[in-house]
Amino acid sequence: MNQMNQTIIDAFHFRHATKEFDPTKKISDEDFNTILETGRLSPSSLGLEPWHFVVVQNKELREKLKAYSWGAQKQLDTASHFVLIFARKNVTAHTDYVQHLLRGVKKYEESTIPAVENKFDDFQESFHIADNERTLYDWASKQTYIALANMMTSAALLGIDSCPIEGFDLDKVTEILSDEGVLDTEQFGISVMVGFGYRAQEPKHGKVRQNEDDIISWIE
């Protein structure tokens, strides 16, 4: 195995779901900006980037979230940086958001936009994404997990620990963030949380996964 391959595999062995971070150790701005940048640069279906990253450093807000986040009790207290990843709602070709992407970000020629819109519509219909608001949201939420994985992997390559978290009361946390003016529920929902920092102690057990033969099939 060459050095680059070994570095990647070592990072995946290093990464584990860190339940408690060392509160005295803080991630440098340079390192955390790199982690955020890998989220921003992540791929998404149709290139629509249906996400928003909220870095919660405010202790009072963390405490409010803790009351309804059973899976983040120690992480909210100890993480150097704590991120909420929002998924955008109702991402279809003709929304203001997608129109802004096409014209303002991707700079499509005006004459090509109708064909792009038709491509988006056809894909979302054939893949049953556009069946209802829930299927649209679930599709957007799936995209956020690509960014989440890339952020955790880049963190591991930097020697930084992380923990993805779904263990929270969705309705209560949504209410808190809405009341705080952090979350516009017309535009976004909470997809997942993730804490970053440096482990308080080493994991008690090594990483255990299924064997390759159990989960990988080759068709040649």
From Swiss-Prot:
Keyword NAD: yes
EC primary class: oxidoreductase
Keyword Phosphoprotein: no
Co-factor(s): FMN
UniProt-listed GO biological process terms: 2,4,6-trinitrotoluene catabolic process
GO MF annotation list: oxidoreductase activity, acting on other nitrogenous compounds as donors, with NAD or NADP as acceptor
This protein's UniProt keywords: Flavoprotein, FMN, NAD, NADP, Oxidoreductase
InterPro entries named among the record's database cross-references: NfsB-like (IPR033878), Nitroreductase (IPR029479), Nitroreductase-like (IPR000415), Nitroreductase/BluB (IPR050627)
GO cellular-component term (any): cytosol
EC number(s) reported in the record: 1.-.-.-
Classification via CDD domains: NfsB-like (cd02149)
Entry's family note: Belongs to the nitroreductase family.
Protein name per Swiss-Prot or TrEMBL: Putative NAD(P)H nitroreductase SERP2086
Species assigned in the record: Staphylococcus epidermidis (strain ATCC 35984 / DSM 28319 / BCRC 17069 / CCUG 31568 / BM 3577 / RP62A)
